[in-house]
Amino acid sequence: MSEPATAEDTALGLLSRPGFAKLLAYRIFAMLSYQVAAVTVGWHIYEVTRNPFSLGLVGLAEVLPFFCVAPFAGYLVDHLPRRRLGMVACSGLIATALVLTGVATGWLPFEGVWPIYAAIALTGMVRAFLSPIYNALFARVLARDQFARGAGLGAVVFQAGMVAGPALGGVLVGFGGKGLSYAVATAFALVAMACLATLKVEEPMHTGPAAPIFKSIAEGARFVVGNRIMVGAMALDMFSVLLGGVVAMLPAFLHEILHHGPEGLGILRAMPALGSVCVGLWLARHPLHRNAGRVLLFAVAGFGLCVIGFGLSQHFWLSALILLFYGAFDGVSVVIRSTILQLATPEEMRGRVSSINGIFISSSNELGAFYAGTMARLLGLVPAVVLGGFAVLSVAGITAWKNPTLRKLNLRDLQ
């Protein structure tokens, strides 16, 4: 059993800590800026081209720079003042949103879509810094025994931004136009920068010459690969999302199976995030200390069962309920993996390890959508999703069998 929490160790107590509250504010406002701009860009690009393929190029223009910059971003986070580096990253978001505002309103004399793609590429490079900076500063504003609760609140903030950002972007475009939406994205990035500018945190002292950049990046990769708990948790999450992602297929299910209009898409898209937020709030109040490995494996298995259930469901509200649990199980995985990342990473490697984790996450999200579409094309919509659910169950079983260190994990042992 865990020890009773003091007032400062409760979820509300953590929010009363100015450093942690400002760090969470930085995270959600940076996320809102990115998400509002991303939704507006999709509308902007399609309005200009009327070509669905151009929407796919938006994702490519963002993710390729992210993958190229992420390893170097982790190195810089580990060797430069993190708060100032975060402010530079926020200035990149501001510059991107300002350029897009100028293009949308005609202030900048650019024509065609390539300036928009260039701005999105800059966003991808900036995004490579956002999570490593958050994770590195997280460990400077909380004590180690507060990491589990803090990770739960961080997951709630992240999911809230994922839900509110696209919704707000759509509303702003609908009622005020693209220029207003981009301007609001600029304002959100300014608020994120202000949060970091006023954040009082003791930065780690860097003594001695820095290792060569590629040697340092390789050192971080070797650390992750050599840590069976960390690499097991990352791989488990990556393969479960890669094989069991159903969000990309929601429009097809609504059209072909559930026979619901576009308003149903908003409901179904919100359900996983709602489930994740609920479980994040619960785990912030009741953090896991014992049997975290078993809980993680059961959560992934539950995630797989939800994928199977969603694939077989032919009723809209049953599908919505299943997606709620789908998000809840995924939320458990996110919180446990985030806590492992914070507890098991040495201070001097937080940036590099967080960047590697970001590459795992982005790989599963981006490739998962491609995999889901390919399998649906080859096997049909329902068989592809059901098969993906069984594949997730297999991944959970194989991990439990092959990685007993992760299976027997108690988070208290890492503190």
Question: What residue spans do the PLM features occupy?
Answer:
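Intrinsic disorder in cytosolic terminal tails and internal cytosolic loops
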Residues: 1-15, 215, 402-415
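Helix-loop boundary and gating motifs at the non-cytosolic
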Residues: 6-64, 222-272
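Short hydrophobic/alpha-helical segments at membrane-entry points of transmembrane helices
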Residues: 22-23, 111-119, 232, 317-323
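Glycine/proline-centered helix-kink
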Residues: 39, 159-170, 248, 280, ...
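Intracellular juxtamembrane helix-capping segments at the cytosolic ends
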Residues: 41, 129-142, 332-345
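C-terminal transmembrane bundle of multi-pass solute transporters/carriers
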Residues: 68-72, 79, 83-95, 99, ...
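Cytoplasmic helix-loop-helix junction between adjacent transmembrane helices
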Residues: 119-160
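Helix-loop junctions on the cytosolic side of multi-pass membrane transporters
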Residues: 136, 140, 182, 188-211, ...
